[in-house]
Amino acid sequence: MTKIKIVVIVGPTAVGKTALGISLAKAFNGEIISGDSQQVYRQLDIGTAKATQEEQEAAVHHLIDIREVTESYSAYDFVQDAQKAISDIVSRGKLPIIVGGTGLYLQSLLEGYHLGGQVDQEAVKAYRNELEQLDDHDLYERLQVNNITIEQVNRRRAIRALELAQFADELENAETAYEPLIIGLNDDRQVIYDRINQRVNRMLENGLLEEAKWLYEHYPTVQASRGIGYKELFPYFVGEMTLAEASDQLKQNTRRFAKRQLTWFRNRMAVSFTAITAPDYPQVVHDRVRDFLGQKEKS
């Protein structure tokens, strides 16, 4: 089977994945698929660092603004949506470029793991029932015991991750239809942390507070409201924190999130990282994509 070539850009938040994705889309006749669990939600633009209108006009983007904030979204949903988007992009002779930071989503798409026929389905059902009886605290303790880190934790995703860990020896690795080139972006920790702090400042200047307040007033308990960028500001709205304290909390949580992202990509995906401050960036990335596609450099 001839596999479909796709480019996947990963790295910590604020590292510049969107800008690189647009650059590659322009250079290699590509379209972008968002691999971010929060960018699927309509009306949540600033806190999710969604591509701006100008950026969306520079390159076609898929899987953003496809859910209402009241709806849930999972790795399973992402795989189904991403597969459809890839098929659509390829059918028009273009290159799919996945840009994202939600490691579980990307791994699910690229590796195609599922609990197949060799697994005792009654055992799976019994284990799932056991997990569903746990409260949130005990469930997340199970995650820690199994050394599982998942982003934007919710119960369904936690239970799924624990199932995969419990029956890892019996997993079937479904043959995927894709041949990915995984491009990792990173740099020195302080460079990334400075970019995160600057991004949070820009978000607040551009209206994040108003966006978060709208979410807090209308849908404070939905899955989308638990995303980094929103929940940190909720204490400010009820007088438990000053705006400066909430802003600092948001920066700190985002830095921790970036660290978890890097840990995930290093441990779970075959990726080599390129420093965004390197003198030959992004040319080195363009060269890698060109080689991957078997294209010659234009003279």
Curated annotation (Swiss-Prot):
SUPFAM superfamilies for this protein: P-loop containing nucleoside triphosphate hydrolases
Enzyme class, broadest EC rank: transferase
Reactions it catalyzes: adenosine(37) in tRNA + dimethylallyl diphosphate = N(6)-dimethylallyladenosine(37) in tRNA + diphosphate
Binding site for ATP: G11, P12, T13, A14, V15, G16, K17, T18
Top-level taxon in the UniProt lineage: Bacteria
Protein's name in the database: tRNA dimethylallyltransferase
Subunit: Monomer.
Keyword entries, A-Z: ATP-binding, Magnesium, Nucleotide-binding, Transferase, tRNA processing
Co-factor(s): Mg(2+)
GO biological process terms on file: tRNA modification
Organism of derivation: Streptococcus pyogenes serotype M5 (strain Manfredo)
Site note Interaction with substrate tRNA, residues: T102, R128
The keyword Secreted is assigned to this record: no
Region (Interaction with substrate tRNA): 36-39
Similarity comment: family membership: Belongs to the IPP transferase family.
GO molecular function, a single term: ATP binding
Binding site for substrate: T13, A14, V15, G16, K17, T18
EC number assigned by the record: 2.5.1.75
Function description: Catalyzes the transfer of a dimethylallyl group onto the adenine at position 37 in tRNAs that read codons beginning with uridine, leading to the formation of N6-(dimethylallyl)adenosine (i(6)A).
Keyword Protease set for record: no
NCBIfam families named in the record: miaA
